[in-house]
């Protein structure tokens, strides 16, 4: 079920404060966050946000096409190692 329009998008308070401070100063620094559930809003465009994937922070450069999506969508948590080439058990 989608979030109510009346409530507006969820963005972590600490993330909003950091972005507003950088926008006021006109700086472009990497912002480190663990908030994967935060929605990307237009004020984040042009910033690089390092999103935690459970092991490390992956840098995500925010563009205008990303607005409305969650930060966690751009930092995958699982690594795909590939299928085994000669797996005789699965062929039976």
Curated annotation (Swiss-Prot):
PROSITE patterns: RIBOSOMAL_S19 (PS00323). InterPro entries: Ribosomal_uS19, Ribosomal_uS19_bac-type, Ribosomal_uS19_CS, Ribosomal_uS19_SF. Keywords: Chloroplast, Plastid, Ribonucleoprotein, Ribosomal protein, RNA-binding, rRNA-binding. It holds the Pfam family Ribosomal_S19. Disulfide bonds: none annotated. One of its GO terms (cellular component) is chloroplast. The keyword RNA-binding applies. It is found in: Plastid, Chloroplast. The keyword Ion transport does not apply. GO terms for molecular function: rRNA binding; structural constituent of ribosome. It comes from the Eukaryota. Its main location: plastid. One of its GO terms (biological process) is translation. NCBIfam families: rpsS_bact (TIGR01050). HAMAP family: Ribosomal_uS19. Belongs to the universal ribosomal protein uS19 family. Protein S19 forms a complex with S13 that binds strongly to the 16S ribosomal RNA. This is Small ribosomal subunit protein uS19c. It comes from Chaetosphaeridium globosum (Charophycean green alga). The lineage of its organism: Eukaryota, Viridiplantae, Streptophyta, Coleochaetophyceae, Coleochaetales.
